[in-house]
Amino acid sequence: NGQESLQEGFEVVNTSTSSFDETWQPVWGENKDIRNHYNELLVELKQTSTGRFMNLRFRVYDDGIGFRYEFPQQRNLVYFVVREEHSQFAMSGDHTAWWIPGDYDTQEYDYTESKLSEIRGLLQGAVSGNASQTVFSPTGVQTSLQMKTAEGLYINLHEAALVDYSCMHLNLDDKNLIFESWLTPDAVGN
């Protein structure tokens, strides 16, 4: 389509911080009250060559962090398809992980427990018989991915708020222990 990538050429236009604290009651669940309390950093970016804007929103909770990309309404970015996302998650060690193979068509697998460095060697054996399978990489896993560090800290990588956006798998660079987001394509390959 001739449009410049949204991967580079951005400058920071503005940053702002805020805090939020509320308690809400779910209709159903184990807890009567749920506290939603976080500190937030909003980074507003402008791509200098195109004049397009993108925001990065980070939220820090007592028990986790989250981030998302936002595309404010703008004349020069009305309709677009995100085919790839290159978010990376660098692990601090060869953690124990509970994972299933990254597959576009099914999540019907038993979980495997292994070190991150062992995923490549175990993945093919973790693929059980199923009529509809599309494993995308020898080191690809599905989210949510649960891990435990040698110090006993639990880590969970997952996506949230998927509105008009593809679900995320993770592809592991097993030499450097870095996961990169890997989006599930739609029916026509976007």
Annotate the PLM regions:
Residues 1-190:
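N-terminal accessory beta-strand-rich subdomains and adjacent acidic, glycine-rich linkers
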